[in-house]
Amino acid sequence: MKKTGFIALLLTLFIAMPMKGQIRGNSINVEVIPDHQDWRYEVGETAIFNIRVTREHTLLNNVKVDYAAGPEMYQDVKKEGVVLKDGTLTLKGKMTKPGFYRVDVKTTIDGKEYKGACGAAFSPERLQPTTVMPQDFNEYWQNAISEARKVDLNPTKRLLPERCTKDVNVYEVSFQNIQWNWRTYGILCVPAEAEANPAKAKCYPALLRVPGAGVRPYGGDIYTASHGAITLEIGIHGISVTMDQKVYDDVFNGALMNYWNWGMDNRDDSYYKRVIIGCIRAIDYIEQYTPWNGEQLAVSGSSQGGFLSLACAGLDKRVTCYAPVHAACCDHTASLKGVACGWPHYFYWNATPHSDYKSENKGKGQEAKINTSRYYDGVNFARLINDKQKGWFSFGYNDDVVPPTTAWATYNTVTGPKEISPYQATWHYWHQEQWDEWENWLLKTLNIER
């Protein structure tokens, strides 16, 4: 091809390409920066918070902010319309007992709200949960699992050729859960060599991925499977996980709206009973119908999935390692004592007004729900984890959905081998480095070489 023709071709391709830049971040930012790099303090120590409002990293003058400060979920200092002449403000705070002191700052500029926060940890290693473990807790759950196993798994398996790679075969699978025809659906990813070579049967570690709250489709963990593991990513609602997103949106906003509140007056009626049993039956499926080696089995998830990770590890000793990330459903009853409680904050909103947490009437009329909550509290499952199960915990100090108070308290209850890796500035989401560390920990703990 002549040079002029080649240049013309390049110009044609360039013009034909859509010119669309990515949208990332904001020009305006609200920063709340503690004076300790690790965001940690001892009880009684004073934390200093430096607040900055910037546009393109340059301080904004005469900007108005509102702020709230104090123990997380119970902030007792609130100011509105504070003018920052040079774009900065300094606040101080301290705690007289272990916990998190949280500062929230927000401003509105050109009609848009911007916010920042900082949750400072005060002696978090001393935090202890409030929830009580019922005497029959483990017995109740083991009996429920035994009853469910009287129902055959009766599995189904459908190849998804459009998702398969040269290294991984991908299937949608389902199996019966707690009773006849109540099914759990998921995406199973199996190394292709496992099915091509019978000699490779029962040679692979396995990872069960459990979901966060909501209703959605799932793609399966092809990446981990490509490194030589069986992965099963499950949904919890008894419906296929390969339909169009609109189906799940309609179900979530209709038939399954607020499912986490269902049946809280009785431990046998809670929606989460079939969810937890379904997770254990997913492990049964892995054991009976995949080339799992019977030795290394991980379970992991975030938010609701973090709670389910704790439940699996606590109830099933086939689980050798678990990785809960900003685990929800931990220490439900903490708000009855004026302490930050785990999502979905059952008694923070639904008991007497949360502003009146010191009242002797706190929780009155909620006795049945309080008792049920103890059977569905991640803390009590964590108490069952033994010294042969390795754990990796991660969460953010700015999380306003799953308070770090509950995450630390749950971590402190575990007596087995464990690691903690907080990413302080995260809210209820992941940082890329956090995701990478989680992924690397799972592969290493499952003895998978990259």
Each language-model region and where it sits:
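C-terminal catalytic histidine-bearing segment of alpha/beta-hydrolase fold enzymes
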Residues: 401-450
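Proline/serine/threonine-rich low-complexity linkers at boundaries of modular beta-sandwich domains
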Residues: 22-30
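N-terminal cap/lid segment of alpha/beta-hydrolase-fold proteins
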Residues: 35-39, 149-201
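Short beta-strand/loop motif that positions the catalytic acidic residue
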Residues: 385, 391-395
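Gly/Ser-rich "nucleophile elbow"/oxyanion-hole loop immediately N-terminal to the catalytic nucleophile
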Residues: 197, 201-202, 257-303
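Hydrolase active-site cap/lid region
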Residues: 306, 310-364, 422, 430
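Active-site nucleophile elbow and catalytic-triad environment of alpha/beta-hydrolase enzymes
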Residues: 365-382
